[in-house]
Structure formats: structure tokens, C-alpha cells
A protein has these predicted regions:
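Catalytic cores of nucleotide-sugar-dependent glycosyltransferases that transfer UDP/GDP/TDP-activated
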Residues: 1-296
């Protein structure tokens, strides 16, 4: 299958959390079983250091909400995977990836740019895999603005992956103008534009990071007010447990740990790494006491 993997961040080029890691290891795994996978992500300021290895693929205007801006697509092959970077200096080349007052506008631009890139590059995926709130408006825009344009748009299926339901992309209603439409039940939630709700309502299929989390987010306690929308899509909503990239996180080659080890030397290696962590955090060096390390 042709898969276009859309992510607001992608390791090793940009990262604030686990989404970037998933954008690294999942496409590699899909390619290993003979799928054609392309990753598309914003060209952030920190990505400029890789620019010399890129080639320009296309440039075109993007129009939305009375705004017209130019985006440039750059391509790079990294570890056998094709990456496309969406460059717009105004929206993306900033110090941080997120957290700006115009985030709705920024990721509206990203959404339109990707949908327009399909025409520019003549690459129409069978599966458009979108992730978290930043890409949540894709299914709505695809349905309302693009499917009617040609058979290739019409036949695209969308998979929406929820990594953290708490961050929904909720904005004032004035941002609806960026989607060239009147208010629509798809994306309005408690009188606000909600990117994640739009994806839950419109995506062909929905998944999240584990079967347990899938069940949790359909409860009022952990659903962050979207449990009702998820229950309505329950038959299309699955939990698939995230794994790790065993090449990237290989203790035999990992340069980020003090002592590497393998299945023959793991007892000594883990003990030495435990000792190093205790020293690093100025804790009592008692190797007989359990040490619990949590990253989250």
C-alpha cells in the first residue's frame, strides 16, 4: 500500500515527545513488510541544519481563510525512508514547535499544504495516517474540499492515531474561518473548534497506543469530554500496543548508556548502569536496593 504518514514531529529531525519516536519506528516497520511509506512533517527552524542534504520537490500557494501563502516542499531520504518537509518561514521556522497563539492557523496551513502536495507531487496515498490534534482537521478538509476533485482524492482512507487525548487542539470559534466553512458539528465541541473531535468524527478508522488506553478514554474519567464521540465510533476504534524500535533501543549498541551489554553480559551491564545512575543523581549507592526509573 501507499501510505502517507503525517506527523507534527518526527525523530531525528524534531521531537517533543513519543509521537516523534513513533514517526520514526513505525514507517520503518511498515517498509520492512513492503509498504511504500512517505513521512511528511513541518520544516522547523532546527531542521535547517539538514538542508544541504535536501532537494526541493515543489512550491505552490496555499489559500485558506482569506490568507494566501507560499509553501515549499523539500525531500530527504533518511535510513531508506523518504521524508517531505513543509517549509513556510512565517509559520514553522520558530524557536518552539508548538505553544503559539496562532497554532490553529499554523496547522491549518500544514493541513492544506499536505492535501495540495498530493496534486503537486502526483502522490496520492491509499492510507493517510494522521496523528494527534495537529493533523486532526485532515479528514474534514479531505471530505469537504478535496474528495470531489478527482478519483484519487476520493479513494483515500484515513487512519487517526491518538497518542494523548488531553491535548485536543481546542480554539476560539473564529478559527473556523481557516477551514473555509461555516460552523460544522464535525469540529465544534463546547462552542470551540476542536481539531481532535474533527478527526474522531471523520476518520475512516481510529486507533490509540494500547488496548487499555483505548478502554480508558471511553470513560468520563479519562475521556476529557470526548468519551462520547469515541463511544460513537467504538466499532472503528482499536488499541494497538506501541512497541519500541529494537535497533534504536539496543543496549548492545546504545551510546547513551554508560555500559553496553548483551544477553550474555546483561547482569553485569545493568548493575554497572544502575551504579552510574545512582552516582549521577547523588543517591546512596546501594546496589541491593531496587531502582525504579520512569520516563513519561
Amino acid at each position: 500500500m501507499k501510505i502517507l504518514f503525517c506527523s507534527a514531529e518526527a525523530y531525528p529531525f524534531s521531537k517533543t515527545g513519543g509521537l516523534a519516536d513513533m514517526a520514526y519506528f513505525l514507517p520503518k516497520s511498515l517498509k520492512s513488510i513492503k509498504h511504500e511509506v512517505v513521512i511528511i512533517t513541518p520544516y522547523y527552524k532546527q531542521i535547517a541544519k539538514h538542508h544541504d542534504k535536501m532537494v526541493e520537490l515543489a512550491r505552490f500557494p496555499v489559500r485558506f481563510g482569506g490568507i494566501e501563502t507560499i509553501v515549499i516542499l523539500f525531500g530527504l531520504n533518511h535510513e531508506g525512508i523518504d521524508y517531505i518537509f513543509v517549509q513556510n518561514m512565517h509559520y514553522f521556522e520558530r524557536e518552539l514547535l508548538y505553544g503559539y497563539s496562532d497554532d490553529a492557523e499554523r496547522f491549518a496551513c500544514f493541513s492544506y499544504a499536505i492535501l495540495e502536495s498530493m496534486k503537486a507531487l502526483k502522490f496520492y496515498p491509499q492510507i493517510l495516517h494522521i496523528n494527534d490534534w495537529q493533523t486532526g482537521m485532515f479528514p474534514y478538509l479531505l471530505d469537504t474540499h478535496y474528495r470531489h476533485q478527482n478519483d484519487q482524492y476520493y479513494s483515500i482512507h484515513t487512519l487517526y492515531s491518538i497518542h494523548n487525548l488531553e491535548y485536543q487542539g481546542s480554539f476560539d470559534t473564529y478559527t473556523s474561518r481557516f477551514f473555509n466553512s461555516d460552523f460544522n458539528y464535525t469540529y465544534i465541541h463546547f462552542d470551540r473548534v476542536n481539531f481532535m473531535k474533527a478527526a474522531i468524527e471523520r476518520a475512516t478508522k481510529i486507533n490509540t497506543v494500547s488496548p487499555t488506553y483505548r478502554n480508558e478514554v471511553m470513560t468520563s474519567e479519562f475521556g476529557f469530554t470526548l468519551d462520547g464521540a469515541l463511544k460513537n465510533r467504538a466499532k472503528d476504534f482499536v488499541g494497538i500496543l506501541n512497541g519500541i524500535d529494537t535497533e534504536l533501543y539496543n543496549p548492545n549498541t546504545d551510546r547513551l548508556i554508560d555500559v553496553t551489554y548483551n544477553k550474555k553480559t546483561y547482569r553485569k551491564g545493568k548493575l554497572l548502569n544502575k551504579e552510574a545512575i545512582l552516582h549521577h543523581f547523588n543517591l546512596d549507592v546501594d546496589l541491593n536496593q531496587p531502582l525504579v526509573v520512569y520516563i513519561g
